[in-house]
Amino acid sequence: MSTIFRGRLRWFPSQSDFSHAPDGRINRMNIADLRQEYMRAGLTEAQADADPIRQFERWFDDVLRARLPLPNAMSLATVSAEGAPSARIVLLKGVERGSFLFYTNYLSRKGRELERRAAACLLFLWSELERQVRIDGTVEKVTTGESDAYYATRPLGARLSAWASAQSDIVGDRKVLENAMEEARRRYGDHPPRPPHWGGYRVMPQEIEFWQGRSDRLHDRLLYRRKGSAWTIERLSP
């Protein structure tokens, strides 16, 4: 267990968390018994920055200092035209001009859903720091120049796979993907251009909630709401 947990978080279940078959194999885990106590820190209105973007940057700096794995991983939730939600993990690639950037295939399920309804919810979970950040906002594509510039920084394999993968489509087997990758490599070599169906989005927040775990489940929840060019801050009951 990492020292950052200081013995308070039960990430590894004990024997009592499992039932066993006669031969000693683990049969199932009693998920309801997995609990943890939140003890690390608090978040008061006096501590919070008036600007939620600056508050996010503060917390993100804490994450980087803690050397957490995949610090920029976030859940991205979208909704279909029929109102069916879907979610997946993507990577934050920048915070600029008050918006949050990520890149993907525009023809993927998330791309198609964002085309129909340009709204999304982002969620960061930093368990080791007992923190979450939820961001609700509208979405727009970044410029082609911005997408070109970021695409050029990606490793060669990642650039080629953007051509090889028709993201979210059904394929017969992995060999189909490997053949498509070889075809992209043969066609473009070491200098693949950016596919027109691949690029970035920016999420422009309308609400940002900061959640800090506290003892006895009396968690701190501060909600920022955009009001014109300013932000209001409200405390939510846990």
What do these predicted regions represent?
Residues 5-6, 28:
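Serine/threonine-rich, low-complexity intrinsically disordered segments
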Residues 6-8, 18:
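Residue-level detector of alpha-helix boundary/anchor positions
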Residues 18-238:
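Binding-site signature for planar aromatic cofactors or substrates
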